[in-house]
Amino acid sequence: MELIDYLKIEQKVHLIGYSMGGPIVGHFANENPNKVESVNFIAPAGYMFKRKSQSNVYLKILNVPFITKYISVVFPSLMYGGNSSIKLSTDEDENRLSQNELNAVYRKQMKYEGFTRSLVSTAKNFNLFNTQKMFQELGKKNINSSVIWGDADEVVPSDGLNYLKSDYPNINYKLVKNARHDLTYALPSIVGKFLSEQLLSFSNNE
């Protein structure tokens, strides 16, 4: 809200939240519905409690105090698939980020101590596992919404989509075949097309 007020944005805004960002924009929209024109999710966290996954195990370990100090070094790579670097899951999209570009971005962000700390702090203090109540409340509000998810997501299992559709009946959705959690930069043509269509549709309905 502070940023919106500072920028003197009077019209309603369109929000997009990816992974951890899903519950974050969802909470904002839920608390400030008069400021939001649409809320759009990309493989949002929040239903991970419904299923045991590798990421759940890593996140729960962070609740053990003496482990936090040591796991903070490797936490980002664990969340990105359990490797020391990120590898694109597919090369079929000609508009994808190249592997070299991705490696460069990954190495750069890992140089910042605050990056790792922020991820660890978010995992420890923000409920990534279960934000179902928030999604249920948001689903009762008349806010345009959409979600895109990969059916092979290894970080945030795509079966969360069924729960999300139940809690948010009017949400527009797209399930991308064989797409994993890196769909934003591995399959940007699909994600970009879906989001642009949703935002255009929501804007025309204003």
Spell out what each predicted region is.
Residues 30-31, 38-70, 133:
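Flexible "cap/lid" loop of the alpha/beta hydrolase fold
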Residues 141, 147-149, 153:
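Short beta-strand/loop motif that positions the catalytic acidic residue
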Residues 1-13:
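Conserved acidic catalytic loop of the alpha/beta-hydrolase fold
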Residues 169-206:
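Catalytic active-site module of serine/aspartate enzymes centered on a nucleophile-bearing elbow/loop
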Residues 50-52, 56, 72-140:
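Conserved alpha/beta-hydrolase catalytic His-Asp/Glu region
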Residues 126-127, 151-156, 181:
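Acidic catalytic loop of the alpha/beta-hydrolase fold
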Residues 17-21, 25:
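Gly/Ala-rich beta-loop-alpha elbow adjacent to hydrolase catalytic centers
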Residues 133-135, 143, 157-166:
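Short alpha-helix in the alpha/beta-hydrolase fold that links the catalytic acid
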